[in-house]
Amino acid sequence: MIVIEIIDIKNFMAHLLLKDTFDHFLLFEARTVTASELLLKGRRRREWYDSDQWSRMCSERGEHDCMHMTWNEMKEIMFHFIKGKKSPQLLYVDLEASSRQREQILGGAFAVQDSELPSLRMQIRYENEHLTIVPAASYPSFLPDRSAGQMWEEALQEFLRRKKIVFHLLNNS
């Protein structure tokens, strides 16, 4: 497991909250603490939608992805909550790669059902003027091959480089 420390926090926050860099990721959970606390859960509530809306959304996005809000759908709420002169005491955003992203990253490396592939998540944490990202692969069942985690770590670092987000790896031993 690696820990990525972001060097230019202001640039990263612009990518996270203002640009479309992370818009296609699924939101698992987001939390921030300022004068009060805001918690956003990314699980989409099926009962909010009529059956036609739900069916259409799931056919467009796929069953897994339609169960979660995208970061694009939720980031404006977070932005309006934290904007101002003071930085939040805490900002935590847990994002998951969409099924399409996961397929691109893992390719045909695993001979298992799609439902048995690991979820690829990044846990973004800003606290005490430090911003870190911890990439994680969460497996729904036991697989002897755990290389998806390493593939995700490498893909995430390359993604950050392409977006010109400056970082270094922390020694997490």
What are the functions of these language-model segments?
Residues 131-173:
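Mixed-charge, glycine-accented linear interaction segment located at domain edges/termini
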Residues 27, 32, 100-102, 131, ...:
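Generic "edge-of-domain/loop-turn" microfeature
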Residues 61-130:
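Surface-exposed, low-hydrophobicity interaction/linker segments
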Residues 10, 19, 41, 75, ...:
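Context-gated lysine
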Residues 52, 62, 68, 80, ...:
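General "foldedness" signal
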